[in-house]
């Protein structure tokens, strides 16, 4: 917590519990000193430890190999999606992140995303905070799949199968 001490001391706590209390009686509650009076309950120790472990794991990876794997998955998915009738890839710059955005002509992106969800495939749908750009190009929304070092070609194949089924079912 950051602030001028005089202001922090004059502010009342907004939560109660744990180490933020100095003493409690039936007549009065006395709050601890700054910053402790704003730290209700037990700190989130388990998640801090988990974050440290995750950071250690990520630091142990060969980042170059991970990036190459991610880009390989993106290229594979792009190739397979481009082979499907009615699928149009959006954003095909040669150097980009391991993300594939696409539309299926005649289908609503949200409907496709919901169908893929029933298959256990997680995608994002919609404007992705780029509504003015999509409006400019007449795109009502896209389906976006992203790939990380832990994804596999088999998972991309499940995505492709799901998109194929969605086209057959929803068209």
Regions found by a protein language model. Give the residues of each.
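Pyridoxal 5′-phosphate
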Residues: 1-171
């Amino acid at each position: 917590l950051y602030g001028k001490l005089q202001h922090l001391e004059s502010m009342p706590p907004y939560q109660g519990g744990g180490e933020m209390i100095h003493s409690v009686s039936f007549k009065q509650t006395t709050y601890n000193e700054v910053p402790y009076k704003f730290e209700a309950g037990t700190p989130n120790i388990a998640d801090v430890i988990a974050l440290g472990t995750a950071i250690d794991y990520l630091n142990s990876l060969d980042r170059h190999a991970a990036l190459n794997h991610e880009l390989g998955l993106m290229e594979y998915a792009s190739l397979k999606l481009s082979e499907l009738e009615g699928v149009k890839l959006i954003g095909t710059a040669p150097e980009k992140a391991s993300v594939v955005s696409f539309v299926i002509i005649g289908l609503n992106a949200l409907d496709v995303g919901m169908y893929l969800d029933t298959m256990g495939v997680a995608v994002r749908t919609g404007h992705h905070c780029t509504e003015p750009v999509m409006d400019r190009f007449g795109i009502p929304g896209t389906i976006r799949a992203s790939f990380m070092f832990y994804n596999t070609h088999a998972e991309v194949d499940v995505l492709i199968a799901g998109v194929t089924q969605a086209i057959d079912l929803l068209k």
